[in-house]
Design a protein with these regions (language model features):
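Hydrophobic alpha-helical transmembrane segments
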Residues: 46, 68-69, 101-102, 136-144, ...
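Interfacial loop-to-helix junctions that mark the boundaries of transmembrane helices
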Residues: 32-41, 60, 64, 87-100, ...
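Transmembrane alpha-helix interface/packing and boundary motifs in multi-pass membrane proteins
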Residues: 54-61, 112, 145-154, 185-197, ...
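Hydrophobic alpha-helical transmembrane segments in multi-pass integral membrane proteins
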Residues: 195, 200, 294-300, 347-365, ...
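Structural signature of hydrophobic alpha-helical transmembrane segments
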Residues: 33-47, 96-109, 155-159, 242-244, ...
Length: 554
């Protein structure tokens, strides 16, 4: 309790000093690379990053240890190449994003308390009843619920709440939970991109690139861009339509990628399930559920009062521990994924060390240089495409939180130097950072949290298994976002709202067509979302290939 309480007040002080913005560490070390060794430091940083990924992909060591080794190697390299004295432990800890760590710790404590009430088992039975036992219908329900919750909470919190439910549900239905969990976390990143509070990169962008924040920039040229800053409502209006366009293609990709595991019907006796998996502690559920509801309401009010979400989560955890069972806290704390928290700490130290070594800044410089090489007429579309895809690929392989923190000042300076409109570039960065997080297991915080909880339950998610599903979904959704940005901000620059309406109508029309096509084949509306359209396309491509090869042989 003391640890959590002191942590809460520490986060309060840090958050208030930073103006309540969340999602990034405001302390920045003054580190300068020795003259003449900049290129060498850059190369060493890149090699360290590749080595860490090699360890994670091949699973030579556990990913937490891989991140710790990478962070240690990066700090040693930074000590060697920097002009300053060796980094102290205090200096190294400033590289850790304590806002993220605090949010995760507080939410894990609350989820641990809730799990003892039996509410997750009850929710699993209710989801089964709604699906009628059809596995694909259940998958669609879980994905859509995840996307909506992620938009209005945040994707990390959503996955902390839904992962135990999904695992319990899979056990009840004798399913392997990993495909369900991967599908959910992919949609948590997609849904979280729709609002300012849904994904950590959006929180950072909304805080740093608001009109008020830009107007306080000491550089007059940058402060002049304040009118182009973005607000909470702007995220919904500008990001929302593209995210809606990604829903059906995303579901079709999930259906195709897991067509064998997420199909069929599981028949269970509902009465027996309700008897076996009922609420075990109604009083505890009322207390902890009420506290969680207040925490969620406080999350909603974050854009208004600017109270750090880490503070809200930590205080909620302390209050819930005190209110439910103040004499027994060991059991709830067993549910805290300490290895996940250590993984994040190592990853933040690694990536911020690479930033000081110049690797991430070099990426930003190359992006700006590439955009500046285009003609004036082509500069805006080129900037949108390059920022979007570089952000997506980089966020897949470098956690999107430190990447976004690095790119925010790069984007602001680039728009001022090249006289580009700021808003389209902001949305390109947000789409790329959020959707790119689906690319790999460590691309987004929600991915890592889900993998940690799944491993604790006995279902480890490998890097390669996640990559096989996540990377294709990332490519498809990023492509959709690119088309949306080009049509709305380049082709339809004079009337962007009209183009948003047209794209939404086309999306609705395609959805109706998909429903009618599926229902004419005897499918339910939800089953229609997973109609085998992709299978038909692939089969047609194979037939075309065979035809061509047959002609050549003749």
């Amino acid at each position: 309790l003391t640890l959590l309480g002191v942590g809460a007040f520490m986060f309060i002080g840090q958050g208030m000093a930073a103006g309540g913005g969340g999602g990034t560490n405001d302390m920045h070390l003054e580190i300068h690379i020795k003259a003449g060794l900049e290129s060498q430091a850059l190369l060493v940083g890149g090699l360290i990053l590749l080595a860490v990924y090699a360890m994670i992909i091949t699973e030579v060591v556990e990913r937490t240890l891989a991140a710790a080794l990478g962070g240690l190697a990066a700090v040693l390299a930074l000590n060697y190449y920097s002009e300053e004295a060796a980094l102290s432990l205090k200096a190294v800890t400033t590289m850790i994003d304590w806002e993220t760590i605090g949010l995760l710790l507080g939410m894990m404590v609350m989820v641990g308390i809730l799990s003892n009430t039996g509410v997750f088992e009850w929710f699993a039975v209710e989801a089964y009843k709604r699906s009628g036992g059809d596995v694909w219908t259940l998958t669609v329900i879980l994905c859509l619920v995840t996307a909506v919750l992620s938009a209005f909470l945040d994707n990390v919190t959503t996955m902390l709440l839904l992962t135990p439910v999904t695992i319990q549900l899979a056990r009840v239905l004798d399913l392997r939970p990993i495909p369900l969990l991967i599908a959910e976390v992919l949609f948590s990143n997609i849904g979280g991109a729709a609002t300012m509070i849904g994904d950590p990169p959006n929180i950072m962008i909304g805080s740093a690139l608001s009109p008020d924040a830009i107007s306080k920039n000491p550089d007059p040229a940058l402060a002049a861009l304040a009118d182009s800053g973005v607000t909470f409502n702007d995220f919904i209006v500008e990001m929302g339509p593209a995210i809606l366009m990604c829903i059906v293609p995303g579901l079709m990709m999930i259906r195709w990628l897991f067509r064998e595991e997420l199909s069929g019907v599981r028949h269970r006796d509902v009465a027996e399930l309700e008897h076996r998996y009922g609420i075990k502690d109604p009083r505890g559920l009322k207390i902890s559920g009420g506290i969680l509801a207040l925490v969620i309401i406080a999350f909603f009010l974050h854009p208004i009062f600017h109270i750090p979400v880490s503070w809200i989560a930590l205080v909620g955890g302390v209050v819930m521990l005190t209110a439910t069972n103040p004499h027994e806290i060991e059991e709830p704390l067993h549910h805290v994924e300490w290895t996940t928290l250590l993984f994040f700490a190592g990853l933040f130290v690694l990536v911020h060390s690479l930033e000081y070594l110049g690797l991430i800044g070099w990426i930003g410089e190359q992006v700006t240089s590439a955009i500046g090489s285009f003609s004036e007429d082509m500069m805006l579309p080129a900037a949108i495409v390059i920022i979007l895809w570089v952000s997506a690929i980089a966020s897949a392989f470098i956690d999107n939180i430190p990447y976004t923190a690095t790119m925010i000042p790069v984007v602001l300076a680039m728009c001022a130097d090249l006289s580009l409109p700021l808003e389209p570039i902001i949305w390109a960065l947000a789409f790329g950072a959020c959707l790119g997080g689906n690319g790999t297991l460590i691309g987004a915080s929600a991915n890592v949290v889900t993998a940690g909880l799944s491993k604790e339950a006995g279902y480890p998610i490998s890097f390669n298994e996640f990559f096989r599903a996540g990377f294709p979904v990332m490519l498809v959704t990023t492509f959709i976002a690119m088309i949306y940005c080009l049509l709305v901000y380049v082709v339809g620059a004079d009337n962007p709202n009209l183009w948003k309406l047209v794209l939404l109508l086309l999306t609705a029309f395609s959805l109706i067509w998909q429903f009618s096509k599926g229902m004419s084949s005897g499918l339910t509306p939800i089953e229609s979302l997973g109609d085998h359209g992709l299978d038909d396309v692939i089969e047609g491509a194979k037939n075309l290939k065979n035809t061509i090869l047959g002609v050549e042989e003749e």
